[in-house]
């Protein structure tokens, strides 16, 4: 009996200690809401984020409440620090100590149960594969003339599609996404997917869109309490995520196997792409007998990372730009006047590639303002402190998750004066030239800068110039698009319709 009493006392003592320690704030940790034993701020965070319209808004409210550009909280057992404001955001993005990625259930679920790819890895694996992937993507034209050629073909295809609508109201987002995805697919797989081809393109887009809506930047309840997948796999979205992961993996593997068969027939294909280059690297390393991290799963995750980085945010930005054009005819006509003049000054067959953007200052400024105003990636991908360090005078524990609020920089009232006003002129100087403001950072900064920035900037610019040049974007009678975006890892506009009226 005494032994039983002793064991009960030990158990009770452990529970009390666990309750106290789980609610204790680390010494000199950034200010934030009080921790609830065992749960941290998880339930409070989810409830308040839903009430105010998103976690990015909640972080800014907490920063104001606690009068700090660093907010410290605890989600489950994970310490989280949110960096807000230009100074803190810039410092986090440029310091090596914050280049890590968290290793948690949420991020492994995003990468199909692995810790592979580029975006969600760190250390030597991240450095080696980012370097290889970016080098090979440049070799096949990423950010160069070959990519411009693919953009030109897709832009002309898109114009034809819009003309065939015969000015009927349409939701443009799917058509835009198909065009952007095809440019990326040409670089990755060496071919485009025809829009009429057995629904493959639409199916892939649907998979990507459905998958992105199942995540938020903190991973939802599954990130803090992974065991919930065993209790409520449907309600937590776990089963659906697994289904979508399986379908995406199958789609990518089919393409990889097709490339493998082609390589077996011709070891030196005339047209290269990322998949060919990767398979060749796998073969070379295997022949050399060296231990290698180059494998099929890593290739699949790399493809997925480029898709996420380069396709959805790009098409959503163009979609938002078209919505603004329809809502602001004054801005649209000013853009049309400059586009017409700039195109007339060039040769008649000169396509408006990004390399010519200096002739389109107002368009360049307009695009920047769309990115600043809507900030579709309000919180960038989570970082991890690689070692214990200091930030803003506070102690940051090793392995703490760091979230970066780009929205707080893009809507900084002290800097922008009128951040809630849509005004492209803020990016035009006294000489009438477009300039980049230091507070403008839609793709992030440093070595963790977005993988898809070159594709995004080129597609957004060229597609918009061509659309404005050939069409008036008009709201149908009774249509009133919402400026409030839908939440997710990236923010997206609510469905809306516009008419594309051919200019004469």
From Swiss-Prot:
Belongs to the cytochrome P450 family. Keywords: Endoplasmic reticulum, Heme, Iron, Membrane, Metal-binding, Microsome, Monooxygenase, Oxidoreductase. PROSITE patterns: CYTOCHROME_P450. This is Probable cytochrome P450 305a1. Pfam families: p450 (PF00067). May be involved in the metabolism of insect hormones and in the breakdown of synthetic insecticides. The lineage of its organism: Eukaryota, Metazoa, Ecdysozoa, Arthropoda, Hexapoda. It is a peripheral membrane protein. One of its GO terms (cellular component) is endoplasmic reticulum membrane.
């Amino acid at each position: 009996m005494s032994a039983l009493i002793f064991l009960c006392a030990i158990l009770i003592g452990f529970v009390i200690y666990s309750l106290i320690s789980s609610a204790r704030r680390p010494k000199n940790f950034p200010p934030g809401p009080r921790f609830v034993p065992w749960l941290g701020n998880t339930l409070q965070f989810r409830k308040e984020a839903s009430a105010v319209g998103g976690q990015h808004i909640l972080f800014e409210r907490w920063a104001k409440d606690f009068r700090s550009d660093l907010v410290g909280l605890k989600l489950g057992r994970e310490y989280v620090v949110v960096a807000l404001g230009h100074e803190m955001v810039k410092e986090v993005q440029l310091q090596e100590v914050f280049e890590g990625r968290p290793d948690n259930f949420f991020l492994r679920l995003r990468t199909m149960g692995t810790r592979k790819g580029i975006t969600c890895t760190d250390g030597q694996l991240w450095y080696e594969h980012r370097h290889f992937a970016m080098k090979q993507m440049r070799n096949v034209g990423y950010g160069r003339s070959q990519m411009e050629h693919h953009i030109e073909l897709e832009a002309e295809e898109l114009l034809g599609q819009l003309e065939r609508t015969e000015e009927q109201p349409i939701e443009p987002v799917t058509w835009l996404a198909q065009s952007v995805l095809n440019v990326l697919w040409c670089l990755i797989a060496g071919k485009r997917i025809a829009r009429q081809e057995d629904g493959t393109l639409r199916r892939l887009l649907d998979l990507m869109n459905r998958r992105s809506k199942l995540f938020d930047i903190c991973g939802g309840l599954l990130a803090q309490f992974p065991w919930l997948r065993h209790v409520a796999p449907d309600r937590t979205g776990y089963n659906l995520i697994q289904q979508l992961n399986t379908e995406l993996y199958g789609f990518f593997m089919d393409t990889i196997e097709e490339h493998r068969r082609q390589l077996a027939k011709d070891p030196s294909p005339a047209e290269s792409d990322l998949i060919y280059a990767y398979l060749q690297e796998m073969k070379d390393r295997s022949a050399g007998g060296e231990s290698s991290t180059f494998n099929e799963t890593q290739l699949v995750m790399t493809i997925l990372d480029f898709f996420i980085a380069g396709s959805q945010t790009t098409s959503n930005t163009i979609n938002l730009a078209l919505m603004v054009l329809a809502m602001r005819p004054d801005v649209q006509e000013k853009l049309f006047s400059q586009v017409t003049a700039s195109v007339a000054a060039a040769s008649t067959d000169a396509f408006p590639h990004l390399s010519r953007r200096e002739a389109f200052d107002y368009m360049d400024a307009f695009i920047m303002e769309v990115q600043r105003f809507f900030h579709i990636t309000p919180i960038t991908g989570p970082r991890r402190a690689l070692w214990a360090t200091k930030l803003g005078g506070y102690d940051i524990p090793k392995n703490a998750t760091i979230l970066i609020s780009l929205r707080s920089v893009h809507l900084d009232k002290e800097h922008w004066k009128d951040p809630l006003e849509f005004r492209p002129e803020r990016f035009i100087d006294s000489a009438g030239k477009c300039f980049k403001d230091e507070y403008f950072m839609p793709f992030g900064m440093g070595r963790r800068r977005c993988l898809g920035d070159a594709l995004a900037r080129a597609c957004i610019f060229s597609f918009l110039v061509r659309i404005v040049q050939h069409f008036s974007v008009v709201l149908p009678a009774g249509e009133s698009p919402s400026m409030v975006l839908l939440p997710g890892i990236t923010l997206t506009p609510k469905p809306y319709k516009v008419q594309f009226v051919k200019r004469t």
